[in-house]
Amino acid sequence: MITREFDTIAAISTPLGEGAIGIVRLSGTDSFAIAQKIFKGKNLSEVESHTLNYGHIVDPQNQEILDEVMLGAMRSPKTFTREDIIEINTHGGIAVTNEILQLAIREGARMAEPGEFTKRAFLNGRVDLTQAEAVMDIIRAKTDKAMNNAVKQLDGSLSNLINNTRQEILNTLAQVEVNIDYPEYDDVEEMTTQLMREKTAEFEALLSNLLNTARRGKILREGISTAIIGRPNVGKSSLLNNLLREDKAIVTDIEGTTRDVIEEYVNIKGLPLKLIDTAGIRETDDLVEQIGVERSKKALQEADLVLLVLNASEPLTDQDRQLLEISKDSNRIVLLNKTDLEEKIELDLLPTDVIKISVLHNQNIDKIEERINQLFFENAGIVEQDATYLSNARHISLIEKALESLQAVNQGLEMGMPVDLLQVDMTRTWEILGEITGDAAPDELITQLFSQFCLGK
């Protein structure tokens, strides 16, 4: 009997809705046979692999033509899933793609589960878990640099690093075993306490360096969480609209117009900035506005960057001073808005690196972008050529656990424990790293990971 893992699956691989092209994908042993039942054109058993073939999709029960298509035929093992794959390129639209999918299912295919095509690629050894996760990162990437990082991971940058480290750990464990089982072998280097200490330090340094990339990787994947704060009606929402170059926030002269937190993404020199337009922080009796103010304070605490907007045409208020105080320890840029009006703000009470802007006239908005680039990218050295960045919370957690196991090895060495008794913690490190690539990942984890994928991927 064909198992559920290896029967023939089908799904629509393009977003539902109107479009130029829609793709219905099949993968499995019977892909060609099922497609032949509904495809009127060349004999698919005779076509060369990796070719596009013109024809029509026809309902075999009544010979009704559903659409004119180009059918992609790809034979295993040189496919994404390492199974036979058929991709029916049809005209985009909800009705036609659904009709073709239902035909394929009626003729023997099964509706694919979310992420099942990529899961099969993993189970068949085409990709490991880090590469499978990179597929989703590519789909979700908001900027070119985020996409490039995901592409490098798909190409095996993280896999190679983890696999090489696991191999070195395995070599160390094997050396300990040989010393125990065959002490008479003089040609095998003895794994002394000092040598084990050196090996452990080497592994720790490598994994620590990788872990240190997590902050930059998180920025690439999720964006810089940027809270725009200020008292009501200083121009926060107008600034958001200027940075986005479109109107997303309501702009009026009425205080308290923004009553909740508005989140939008903008591309700053190839990196994602998650802009959070907060409700003006002030004392208010309006219950709805109070909730917005509390959310603003929370956004301020969690932000990677704070843009504090002040009104340059008015003296500092108590609210301004409060905001300057509560944001002083943040990664902050102070912006003086309304500089097109007469300047009345006390400059001597402000940081020296304030940026003067006018959101009404779109003046110096580019200087904000330049400052952000300096703070996060140029000074921090983010996105070095060919660097590998940890951007996945699962990977980060497992690297931290692997380092804990190595620290346990070090503690044992400091206590004078024999090298052979430290194998357990060293082996645990090897196993944890295997969870990253999927070599030692439990089935429940694999199922959960792929369930997060979209249908048809």
UniProtKB/Swiss-Prot annotation:
The keyword Kinase does not apply. Coiled coil: none annotated. Residues 223-377 form the TrmE-type G domain. GO terms for cellular component: cytosol. Homodimer. Heterotetramer of two MnmE and two MnmG subunits. Belongs to the TRAFAC class TrmE-Era-EngA-EngB-Septin-like GTPase superfamily. TrmE GTPase family. Exhibits a very high intrinsic GTPase hydrolysis rate. Involved in the addition of a carboxymethylaminomethyl (cmnm) group at the wobble position (U34) of certain tRNAs, forming tRNA-cmnm(5)s(2)U34. This is tRNA modification GTPase MnmE. It comes from Streptococcus sanguinis (strain SK36). The lineage of its organism: Bacteria, Bacillati, Bacillota, Bacilli, Lactobacillales. The gene is mnmE.
